[in-house]
């Protein structure tokens, strides 16, 4: 894991591992330091680096800018230089055939998220996921990458872990499984159902459970669940084997007005099955009309919506995970 006592270097490393397009490089005085260069190489570019390496195309782009910045920072070449390890790593990447940008966007790659709010002792809490960084996959699903609302809801739960600790959780629209892994690995939930309406997304969840050491855990259960479809079939007496659900989580599941009626129908059925259940939704306000449509639909079906005071931190304030700060993300508790 990222091991650097310098905040600038650590921040750069965590941003890189999250495959951020805009990186906060350490200042020149640090970059020209031999020890800092070696730390960056060992943490990010060495074949035996402690986290899975990002795609070759991304590594090469960052290495080019990094070495250029180091070169610009050097005032005395008798005293400082560019690490041979960094130059060798770049030369190897230059010699490799690389996929096109379009091809690279569809490939699944490792993305590591640093959980700064859970920092403690020598442990560097993090979640590594296999993701497709394109906005929409070739199959049409949006669930193969982690969206900002999941990261923001994860931060909210990290400082309010009592909401899920020792609880049985159902996540709607789990996507890459970020929240499910967070709850099961770090927040002390007793069980998480990681549900999604896409069969492809549910099938790929096993990869991300494996990467995070949860492949043999009975704390996470992937499930295909389509909103608006009856939870109880004609041959079932109890849904989910009659096991209770305490909390429902959903991040970025109100993205389109067309899905809202089916979502509300599923929430109604869950409330009927589990009276008193807690429902926590994180909604990204890309379009004010869509968000207001969701609020109106909740009101018509008897749900009260209580917004939480948990604004998106500015980019400068973020220490990991990193996400856009220009669009509001509303965290709401629903009750009926």
From Swiss-Prot:
For whether the record's keyword set contains Cytoplasm, the answer is yes
Domain of life of the organism encoding this protein: Eukaryota
Q: What is its main location?
A: cytoplasm
- One Pfam family named in its UniProt record: Methyltransf_16
The UniProt function text for this chain reads: S-adenosyl-L-methionine-dependent protein-lysine N-methyltransferase that methylates elongation factor 2.
Q: Which family does it belong to?
A: Belongs to the class I-like SAM-binding methyltransferase superfamily. EEF2KMT family.
Name the Gene Ontology biological process terms. methylation
Q: Where in the cell is it found?
A: Cytoplasm
- What's a single GO CC term here? cytoplasm
**UniProt KW keywords:** Cytoplasm, Methyltransferase, S-adenosyl-L-methionine, Transferase
Database matches in InterPro entries? Methyltransf_16, SAM-dependent_MTases_sf
Q: What is this protein called?
A: Protein-lysine N-methyltransferase EFM3
Species: Chaetomium thermophilum (strain DSM 1495 / CBS 144.50 / IMI 039719) (Thermochaetoides thermophila)
Q: Which residues form a coiled coil?
A: none
**Which of this chain's residues are annotated to bind S-adenosyl-L-methionine?**
147, 173-175, 196, 232, 251
Task: Provide any one GO MF term from the record.
Answer: S-adenosylmethionine-dependent methyltransferase activity
- This entry's Enzyme Commission designation comes to 2.1.1.-
